[in-house]
Amino acid sequence: MSRLELGKEAVALLTLYEEGVKSLAIVDTLRSARQEQYRKHRMPWFLLQTRLQVRVIESAQLGMLPMPIPELLKEAVAVQPLNLNGIAHSSSSINSFLLFE
């Protein structure tokens, strides 16, 4: 294997490692947020996860870059009115679609 090939392989492995570290950091942040959110507001994890997904999808539809995870979490846990079934309502049609699926 030539030095060039070894260099390319090393760069690829380093990139994979960096992406893995970022992914682990995101998972750790979400896990911490999940525990803290449940402790504070007793919000079920699936509802927090759904709200996060909605924020990411809405950002993509608007052509915006995804927000950093801490900002997404702040928006996702924002208090929203609940209906009689305990489901959050929003003016966004995608929110309604995802929450009822």
Curated annotation (Swiss-Prot):
Protein's UniProt keywords contain Mitochondrion: yes
Predominant location category: mitochondrion
Compartment(s): Mitochondrion
Domain of life: Eukaryota
One Gene Ontology cellular component annotation held by this UniProt entry: mitochondrion
Keywords assigned: Mitochondrion
Extra remark beyond the main annotation: A stretch of 270 kb of the mitochondrial genome is duplicated within the centromere of chromosome 2 resulting in the duplication of the gene. The expression of the duplicated gene is not demonstrated.
Protein name: Uncharacterized mitochondrial protein AtMg00260
